[in-house]
Amino acid sequence: MKSTIFFILSLLLMLENQAAGRRLSGSAGAQDPVISRVWAKSQDMEEAVSGSGLTAEGGRGSDREESVGERVSLRQEEFEKGHIRSSVEEPEGEHVSVRREHLEKSHIRHNVEEPEGERVSVRREHLEKSHIRHSAEEPEGERVSVRHERVEKTHKRFHDDSVEESDSASSVDHRKKGHIRFKRQDPIAALAAIEGQDAVKDSLWVKGQASSEERFSVKGQDLVKGHLQMKGQSSLAERFSVTGQDSVKGRLQMKGQDTLAERFSMTGQDSVKSRLQMKGQDSLSERFSMTGQDSVKGRLQMKGQSSLAERFSVTGQDSVKGRLQMKGKDTLAERFSVTGQDSVKGRLQMKGHDLLEERFSVSGQDSVKGLARIKGQESVQSGFSVKGQGSLKGLI
């Protein structure tokens, strides 16, 4: 009697598993290697979804929408488990979510032609788990979030009438966890954060005409390389921070016409190399600070026409080398201070037409070498003081 009941229960369980497999294959497309294609068009009043595969069931449905044209196409191979959901709201509300596991190649393209032109394309190869969500709200609200594990190549492109932005990230090694979130409003605010364990190489390029705010942060354990270029006409505010354990290399170039405010800070344990160039016409304020344990090398060049205020401070334990060049036409005020334990070398050159005030102070324990040159046409005020315990050589 017990064996008969057990046999009946096992048979019912097998039938239930087969029915669940049929439902899953009907909703996702396929479980084994499958080539499927989904088209969704809603230009005037039409939307069609079709799927074909080895063990997939095809379906066709229609939905109506007004005043929005969009196109979504998906193509993938070796699709294990997948869930595709698409819903369209009115007016200008669009929500597309894709969730899949272990697909080899995929291509997603989204085009909206009326009334606003935008383009989002994602191309990746061999990702284990991914989740893509895209929603558009009114007015001009757009959000794209991508979360994936073990991504080889990723490419995303966003195009609009007034602003063109491109964000690309590629990793040679395997990335553990990544999250990219993009928000766009009026004015534009963009946030991009990438966290990796092995190696990360990123390049970000932003161009804007009206106003732009951008934050970029990279955290890694082994090796981090970043390159950032920003150009703007009206106003530009930017923060760039890099934190690493082994080696950090960063380069920053900023150009602006009206106002420019920038902060640059770097902290590392082994070696830090940085180069900063800034050019402005109206007003320029800049702070540059570096802290390191082993070796620090910094170079700063600043040019301005109206007014210029700058502070430069370097603190290190082993060796410090600094070079500062400043040129101005109207007024110029500058402070330069160096503090170190072993050896300090500094060189200062200043040229001005109207008024020039300069202070130079050096404190060290072992040896100090300094060279100061000042040239002016109308009036010059200079102070030079040196304190040291070992030896001192100075030439004015």
Swiss-Prot record:
Q: Where is this region: Disordered?
A: 45-178, 377-396
* UniProt repeat feature SVP-3/-4 repeat, residue ranges: 65-88, 89-112, 113-136, 137-157
UniProt cross-references to PROSITE patterns, sorted A to Z: SVP_I
Which InterPro entries did the record assign?
SVP_I (IPR002098)
* Cellular component per GO, a single term: extracellular region
Residue stretches of biased makeup (Basic and acidic residues): 60-152
Q: Which residues form the signal peptide?
A: 1-21
One biological process term from GO is: mating plug formation
Spell out the residue numbers of the propeptide. 177-192
Q: Which domain of life is it from?
A: Eukaryota
SVP-1 clotting repeat start-end pairs: 194-217, 218-241, 242-265, 266-289, 290-313, 314-337, 338-361, 362-385, 386-396
Location of the region described as 9 X tandem repeats of SVP-1 like motif in the Swiss-Prot/TrEMBL record: 194-396
Cite the post-translational modification comment.
SVP-3 may be a post-translationally modified form of SVP-4. Covalent clotting of SVP-1 is catalyzed by a transglutaminase secreted by the anterior prostate through the formation of gamma-glutamyl-epsilon-lysine cross-links. The conserved 2 Lys and 1 Gln residues per functional unit seem to be the residues involved in the formation of those cross-links.
Q: Which UniProt keywords apply?
A: Cleavage on pair of basic residues, Copulatory plug, Repeat, Secreted, Signal
Name its cellular compartments. Answer: Secreted
Q: Is Transferase included in the keywords of this UniProt record?
A: no
Query: Does the keyword Nucleotide-binding feature in the UniProt annotation?
Result: no
Name the family the entry cites: To the SVP-2 precursor, particularly in regions where protein processing must occur.
- Reported function: SVP-1 serves as substrate in the formation of the copulatory plug. SVP-3 and SVP-4 may also contribute to the clot.
Miscellaneous notes for this chain?
A: SVP-1, SVP-3, and SVP-4 are 3 of the 4 major secretory proteins, secreted by the guinea pig seminal vesicle epithelium (sve).
Write the protein's name: Seminal vesicle major clotting proteins
Species per Swiss-Prot/TrEMBL record:
Cavia porcellus
